[in-house]
């Protein structure tokens, strides 16, 4: 009899067994794909990431420990010390503080523009060292809606990606990639997981 679970198993282990120390070394050096520390990756997380990726219409996904970690990695994998990011003013306060204070101390500058700014104001926010544009689909808590197509066009005209935090609408209500976003983040404990509704 074939048993197919309707729920994925929860892998609780933190470490894995390996056939050789050489293979383990390649894993730790990120030269091989596989599991070596569950905080970074495990089969449960991979399954959840794949489901969210499918819902968003994306090509790849990963889970992080929080929505703030997702936003940090989305920006920090693109921008480093001496770089610049254009960002909507209507974003979650924690994200604003991450960008305006923490990442500023790391040498990344942010220019904040209103999501309802004119095309000229948006254009003037770009610099030669701009590496990305960031916004929230529906801002938390202001509920301001980002014109994803307009911000995507501005980003792409400058050869940089648009990163969109899609926490509030979730991919059930909006799929930013279909409107031009390149990277989508979530705080899954907010609405995807519905922990506040149970």
What is the predicted function of each stretch?
Residues 1-5, 193-198:
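Conserved small/polar residues in nucleotide/adenosyl-binding loops
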Residues 4, 29-32, 135, 183-184:
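Short, functionally important structural connectors and interaction interfaces within domains
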Residues 5-21:
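N-terminal amphipathic/basic leader segments beginning at the initiator methionine
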Residues 20-72, 94-103:
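Conserved N-terminal alpha-helix of the aminotransferase class I/II PLP-enzyme fold
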Residues 61-196:
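Conserved PLP-enzyme active-site core in the AAT-like
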């Amino acid at each position: 009899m074939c048993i197919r679970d309707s729920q994925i198993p929860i892998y609780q282990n933190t470490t894995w067994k390996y056939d050789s120390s050489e293979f383990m070394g390649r894993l730790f050096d990120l030269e091989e794909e596989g599991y070596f520390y569950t905080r970074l990756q495990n089969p449960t997380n991979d399954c959840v990431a794949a489901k969210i990726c499918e819902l968003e219409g994306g090509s790849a996904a990963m889970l992080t420990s929080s929505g703030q970690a997702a936003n940090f990695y989305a920006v920090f994998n693109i921008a480093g010390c001496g770089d610049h990011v254009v960002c909507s003013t209507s974003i979650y306060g924690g994200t604003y503080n991450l960008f305006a204070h923490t990442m500023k101390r790391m040498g990344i500058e942010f220019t904040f523009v209103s999501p309802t700014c004119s095309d000229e104001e948006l254009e003037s926010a770009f610099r030669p060292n701009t590496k990305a544009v960031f916004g929230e689909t529906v801002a938390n808590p202001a509920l301001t809606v980002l014109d994803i197509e307009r911000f995507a066009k501005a980003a792409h005209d400058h050869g940089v990606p648009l990163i969109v935090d899609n926490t509030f609408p979730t991919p059930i209500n909006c799929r930013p990639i279909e409107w031009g976003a390149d990277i989508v983040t979530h705080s899954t404990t907010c609405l995807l997981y519905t922990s506040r509704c149970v």
